[in-house]
Amino acid sequence: MASVLSYESLVHAVAGAVGSVTAMTVFFPLDTARLRLQVDEKRKSKTTHMVLLEIIKEEGLLAPYRGWFPVISSLCCSNFVYFYTFNSLKALWVKGQHSTTGKDLVVGFVAGVVNVLLTTPLWVVNTRLKLQGAKFRNEDIVPTNYKGIIDAFHQIIRDEGISALWNGTFPSLLLVFNPAIQFMFYEGLKRQLLKKRMKLSSLDVFIIGAVAKAIATTVTYPLQTVQSILRFGRHRLNPENRTLGSLRNILYLLHQRVRRFGIMGLYKGLEAKLLQTVLTAALMFLVYEKLTAATFTVMGLKRAHQH
């Protein structure tokens, strides 16, 4: 129990949250482009830079940063929960021994499930706020009018029921394999490099973080597309298809996507997603590693568990 409520776990959680917020702020416009490509499938522009130029031209210079605060708030909470859970469980399970790839995957999966169940309502709200006021090509999208985070929560609960705050939970639970795979490769690659050298450089951490995220994102991207559509929740779908992120709804959306756009329709926006998530993850891990190392050094502590 001491491992779960330890100061070391808190340091990891805060460093992870700060790292993710820093990285997402830097690369936020890329996430805006990715989300538009996923949700507004009738948009003619197919590349990241063309979508961003289109958004700036039609909606203003700051439009790529629309919804920044709710996204950053959600990301901060989400990564705090994930890093805290991941490092607490790892410390509890490993207990001073060397970790393994299998253990990293299991711990990452459990941490992901806890994170999804606690933070999905925040992501549903931030997805809608981020797309509010956007000029869509898809006439099936119903516009929203939220005054802020609290008002968005209020309107969603009032008009759609409290269960709507967990829209996309099922694909999100499937997508816990994304961070689990990411952390498995990250920790595994880090262990391999540390066998050959005493300390990792900033470039080492950046590259390892980028490679781990690229693999995880490519494997799980079709489900991420479905997740974005379900979280947005403003498409005019048939009532029987508007279930709470059920397997039936996921299969329906995947089928519709393939029928209308071919198999590559499942990967629409992947370029923007890879560009954004790979760079964001790499920078996040870099900030995270530097912050944890500096904090442990200043406080005269050793890491709670070995990698």
UniProtKB/Swiss-Prot annotation:
Its chief place of residence is cytoplasm
Repeat (Solcar) residue spans along the chain: 7-92, 99-192, 200-294
GO biological process entries: ATP transport; fatty acid alpha-oxidation; fatty acid beta-oxidation; fatty acid transport; nucleotide transmembrane transport
Annotated segments matching region Necessary for targeting to peroxisomes and interaction with PEX19: 1-147, 244-307
Q: What tissue expression does the UniProt record report for this protein? A: Ubiquitous. Expressed in liver.
Q: Which residues lie on this side of the membrane: Cytoplasmic?
A: 1-9, 88-104, 182-202, 302-307
Subcellular localization is given as: Cytoplasm; Peroxisome membrane
Query: Does the record's keyword annotation contain Transit peptide?
Result: no
Membrane-side (Lumenal) residue stretches? 31-66, 126-160, 224-280
Report keywords, A-Z: Antiport, Cytoplasm, Membrane, Peroxisome, Repeat, Transmembrane, Transmembrane helix, Transport
Supply the InterPro entries for this chain: Mit_carrier (IPR002067), Mito/Peroxisomal_Carrier (IPR052217), Mitochondrial_sb/sol_carrier (IPR018108), Mt_carrier_dom_sf (IPR023395)
Motif Peroxisome localization signal in this chain: 190-199
The domain-related comment in the record is: The N- and C-terminal portions are exposed to the cytoplasm. Lacks a typical peroxisomal sorting signal. A region between helical transmembrane domains (TM) 4 and 5 and TM1-TM3 or TM4-TM6 are necessary for the peroxisome-targeting activity.
Which PANTHER family is this protein grouped with?
A: PEROXISOMAL MEMBRANE PROTEIN PMP34 (PTHR45939:SF5), PEROXISOMAL MEMBRANE PROTEIN PMP34-RELATED (PTHR45939)
The similarity comment for this entry is:
Belongs to the mitochondrial carrier (TC 2.A.29) family.
Name the record gives this protein: Peroxisomal membrane protein PMP34
Q: Which gene encodes it?
A: SLC25A17
